[in-house]
From Swiss-Prot:
Annotated PROSITE patterns: RIBOSOMAL_L31
GO molecular function, one term: structural constituent of ribosome
Gene3D superfamilies: Ribosomal protein L31 (4.10.830.30)
GO biological process: translation
Name of the protein in its database record: Large ribosomal subunit protein bL31B
Domain of life (superkingdom): Bacteria
Assembly behavior: Part of the 50S ribosomal subunit.
UniProt family annotation: Belongs to the bacterial ribosomal protein bL31 family. Type B subfamily.
Gene that this sequence comes from: rpmE2
Coiled coil (residue ranges): none
GO CC annotation, single: ribosome
Amino acid sequence: MKQGIHPDYHPVVFRDISADTAFLTRSTVTSSTEIKWQDGNTYPVIDVDITSASHPFYTGKAKIVDTAGRVEKFNRRYGKK
């Protein structure tokens, strides 16, 4: 890799505010807020709305959407007459 052209890649904590879960990973994103992690070190923290801990697909709480009903409703409303 060329020196001096890549962004700083450092440990960051991503905190899921809806599931009250945090993940320590590496990223180029920066933050002015910090959090003390379980290992005793302080890391920048990024608050996010959805992660794998709260997304319905990953938690198994996905809802089935009635797309056929939506298509029929659309055709009734805007379809050919």
